[in-house]
Amino acid sequence: MNNMHSQTTIAAIATPPGRGGVGVIRLSGPKAYDIAQKLTQKNLPEARMAGFRKFYDTDGSIMDEGIVLCFPNPHSFTGEDVVELQGHGGPVIQNALLGRLFELGAIAAKAGEFSMRAFENGKMDLVQAEAIADLIDATSQAAARSAVRSLQGAFSTKINTVLEKLIHLRLHVEAAIDFPEEEIDFLADGKILALLEDVQQSVHAVQTSARQGQLLREGLQVVIAGKPNAGKSSLLNALAGVERAIVTDIAGTTRDVLHEKISLNGLPITLTDTAGLRETGDIVEKEGIRRAIKEIEQADLLLLVYDLNQGDDPLKLAQEYFSEHIEPRRLMLIGNKCDLTGQSAEISDYQGFRHITVSAKQEMGVQGLVDAITAHAGFHPEEDTFIARTRHLDAMKRTQLYLAEAREQLVIFNAGELVAESLRLAQNALGEITGDFSADDLLGKIFGSFCIGK
């Protein structure tokens, strides 16, 4: 792959902002060694050997001192000459050193530019580059382990295996088109259809695994809603395992939206407690209800909590407040305070909806609710689950659509040229995942979300 940046040398602080014992500045590019040598006024240490050096300012005064590490191309993270300067971690000295590197010929790295260069130089594919950011942003050990698997190539290997099958299929189709004089009709003999169906099944298998990886990365947005004093905040506290929300007997205690990031059975959850739904003249409470409706509209799953003691019909409440805002499949009915009614905590069906009775205060039925939430998400990660993103699933969905088109053209019309075109589009869509086929704006969007020093 052509490296558009091969003539420039970039520099950036690679450690998080703030004070610390050590601060790392990274250089990458053809002049990295030359710039580092001018900064230290001494020969650089051997490749991959740590060397202690002083860092000098323009007037010859010492700015700082620390460790220098050199990684010659192509055996470096970016595939270029790379130098890492490990000095003291104060922001003042780090910025001063960075400014000195700019004086010596380096330019400021853009967000994700080190990883972009690694991708362009064939050191990693797009999935592995994204996995670096996902590993840094991981919110659970399971997500971190899955990101490491993607970084090590688990996801890429699966995609490349399917791509090889797809290319093999395209070769058969192209041969059938290019050699029509052959006595055997390769399009109609069943072999190409069998190969096509095998590719479809392979994509489906990767999709299933990728969906688990996407859930690990992006989690589930779960909103708790209901009438005042139904026990919404108690339920949030029970699920979160801490007293995060204020709980009183006074209706309308929660007037704003409260977010809590938790993990349920390993699934990252953003749990949202909302203001009680009721008619009110209170301006502040009205605003809280407006925000609650907004959260409900964006929820992956709504837990509609009602008080079993009050004899409320939860579906009537749902229709009154947000029937226009939520699909039935995203709604779960939670009958709370079963300890006061003598009912057992159980899961049942209520007019086609999942219905769960709990006691949030006594934590009766809470584990059953947790299991129901993760089951609703379809979350059941395996040991080899890899991290995945929405764009990966979108690419596989388009791949399946093109494969379905190819199957239709083959089975119904026996139209070789149209089959070939659909297969080409399928390969391009699947190739977007690893970067084998990528538009520049896609690359810019992906790497632009990275931190500067990556």
UniProtKB/Swiss-Prot annotation:
<dbReference type="GO" id="GO:0003924">
    <property type="term" value="F:GTPase activity"/>
</dbReference>
<feature type="binding site">
    <location>
        <begin position="229"/>
        <end position="234"/>
    </location>
    <ligand>
        <name>GTP</name>
    </ligand>
</feature>
<feature type="binding site">
    <location>
        <position position="454"/>
    </location>
    <ligand>
        <name>(6S)-5-formyl-5,6,7,8-tetrahydrofolate</name>
    </ligand>
</feature>
<dbReference type="Pfam" id="PF12631">
    <property type="entry name" value="MnmE_helical"/>
</dbReference>
<comment type="similarity">
    <text>Belongs to the TRAFAC class TrmE-Era-EngA-EngB-Septin-like GTPase superfamily. TrmE GTPase family.</text>
</comment>
<feature type="binding site">
    <location>
        <position position="229"/>
    </location>
    <ligand>
        <name>K(+)</name>
    </ligand>
</feature>
<feature type="binding site">
    <location>
        <begin position="273"/>
        <end position="276"/>
    </location>
    <ligand>
        <name>GTP</name>
    </ligand>
</feature>
<keyword id="KW-0547">Nucleotide-binding</keyword>
<feature type="binding site">
    <location>
        <position position="84"/>
    </location>
    <ligand>
        <name>(6S)-5-formyl-5,6,7,8-tetrahydrofolate</name>
    </ligand>
</feature>
<dbReference type="InterPro" id="IPR025867">
    <property type="entry name" value="MnmE_helical"/>
</dbReference>
<feature type="binding site">
    <location>
        <position position="250"/>
    </location>
    <ligand>
        <name>K(+)</name>
    </ligand>
</feature>
<keyword id="KW-0479">Metal-binding</keyword>
<dbReference type="InterPro" id="IPR018948">
    <property type="entry name" value="GTP-bd_TrmE_N"/>
</dbReference>
<feature type="binding site">
    <location>
        <begin position="248"/>
        <end position="254"/>
    </location>
    <ligand>
        <name>GTP</name>
    </ligand>
</feature>
<dbReference type="InterPro" id="IPR027266">
    <property type="entry name" value="TrmE/GcvT_dom1"/>
</dbReference>
<dbReference type="GO" id="GO:0002098">
    <property type="term" value="P:tRNA wobble uridine modification"/>
</dbReference>
<dbReference type="InterPro" id="IPR005225">
    <property type="entry name" value="Small_GTP-bd"/>
</dbReference>
<feature type="binding site">
    <location>
        <position position="254"/>
    </location>
    <ligand>
        <name>Mg(2+)</name>
    </ligand>
</feature>
<dbReference type="InterPro" id="IPR004520">
    <property type="entry name" value="GTPase_MnmE"/>
</dbReference>
<keyword id="KW-0342">GTP-binding</keyword>
<keyword id="KW-0819">tRNA processing</keyword>
<dbReference type="Pfam" id="PF01926">
    <property type="entry name" value="MMR_HSR1"/>
</dbReference>
<keyword id="KW-0630">Potassium</keyword>
<protein>
    <recommendedName>
        <fullName>tRNA modification GTPase MnmE</fullName>
        <ecNumber>3.6.-.-</ecNumber>
    </recommendedName>
</protein>
<dbReference type="InterPro" id="IPR006073">
    <property type="entry name" value="GTP-bd"/>
</dbReference>
<keyword id="KW-0460">Magnesium</keyword>
<dbReference type="GO" id="GO:0030488">
    <property type="term" value="P:tRNA methylation"/>
</dbReference>
<dbReference type="GO" id="GO:0005829">
    <property type="term" value="C:cytosol"/>
</dbReference>
<dbReference type="GO" id="GO:0046872">
    <property type="term" value="F:metal ion binding"/>
</dbReference>
<dbReference type="InterPro" id="IPR027368">
    <property type="entry name" value="MnmE_dom2"/>
</dbReference>
<feature type="binding site">
    <location>
        <position position="26"/>
    </location>
    <ligand>
        <name>(6S)-5-formyl-5,6,7,8-tetrahydrofolate</name>
    </ligand>
</feature>
<feature type="binding site">
    <location>
        <position position="248"/>
    </location>
    <ligand>
        <name>K(+)</name>
    </ligand>
</feature>
<keyword id="KW-0378">Hydrolase</keyword>
<feature type="binding site">
    <location>
        <position position="123"/>
    </location>
    <ligand>
        <name>(6S)-5-formyl-5,6,7,8-tetrahydrofolate</name>
    </ligand>
</feature>
<comment type="subunit">
    <text>Homodimer. Heterotetramer of two MnmE and two MnmG subunits.</text>
</comment>
<dbReference type="Pfam" id="PF10396">
    <property type="entry name" value="TrmE_N"/>
</dbReference>
<keyword id="KW-0963">Cytoplasm</keyword>
<feature type="binding site">
    <location>
        <position position="253"/>
    </location>
    <ligand>
        <name>K(+)</name>
    </ligand>
</feature>
<dbReference type="InterPro" id="IPR027417">
    <property type="entry name" value="P-loop_NTPase"/>
</dbReference>
<feature type="binding site">
    <location>
        <position position="233"/>
    </location>
    <ligand>
        <name>Mg(2+)</name>
    </ligand>
</feature>
<dbReference type="GO" id="GO:0005525">
    <property type="term" value="F:GTP binding"/>
</dbReference>
<comment type="function">
    <text>Exhibits a very high intrinsic GTPase hydrolysis rate. Involved in the addition of a carboxymethylaminomethyl (cmnm) group at the wobble position (U34) of certain tRNAs, forming tRNA-cmnm(5)s(2)U34.</text>
</comment>
